[in-house]
Amino acid sequence: MKKSIPILLAVLLCLCTQTFAQNRADELMKQAQENLAKKEYIKARYLFLQAYNAFATQENYAQAVKCGVNASALYHRENYYKEAFELLRNAELLVRTGEQKLKKDFPDLRFRINKERLQMYISLRNPTRAKEQLNRLEETAKAAQNDSLSNDFLYTQASYYYTFGMNSQGDTAFKKLIEQYKQKRTTPKRMNAIKIS
C-alpha cells in the first residue's frame, strides 16, 4: 500500500505535466497569432518559435511545422534569411524523425516547409534554387495525393513563373488549375445530384 502511493503520485504528476505542456504550447501559438494580427512581428516571431519548440518536444509534428513555418516567414520578412533557413532545416529534420518513428510519411508537412523555402528563394531572386524547390514541391504534392495541395502547387507554380518573367508557362499552370476546378465541379457525385434534381 505504501509503495503504491508514491507510484500513483508520480503517474499523476507526469499526467499533469504533460497536460500543462500541451496547454502551454497551444497558448503560445494563440498569443503568437494575436500578436501577428496586431502586426507585432518580433513578438509574434518569438512566440511562434517558442510554440514550435514546445510542440516539437511533444512530438506534435503538424503544429510544430505550422509554428516553425510561421516563425520562418517572419524571419524572412525581416531579411533574417540565415535564421529562417536554419529553422526550416530543423523543421525538416523533425518531420524526418517523426516519419521514421511512426513509419509514416508526412508529405503535407514537407509541402509547407518546401513552399516557405521556395518563397524565400523567390524573394532572394534566385531562380535556380527556387526551381529546385518548385520541383521538390511538385514531388511532395504528388506524393500527398491531395487535391488541395495539388491546387496550391499549381498556384505557386504559376506565381513562380510570373515572378521570373515566364508568362506563357505561368498561363499554362493557371489553365491546369482551372481545369482541376472544372473537373472537381463535374465529379460523378455532382453529376448524379444534377440528374436526380
Regions found by a protein language model. Give the residues of each.
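Bacterial Sec-dependent N-terminal signal peptides
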Residues: 1-31
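A "functional boundary" signal
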Residues: 20-197
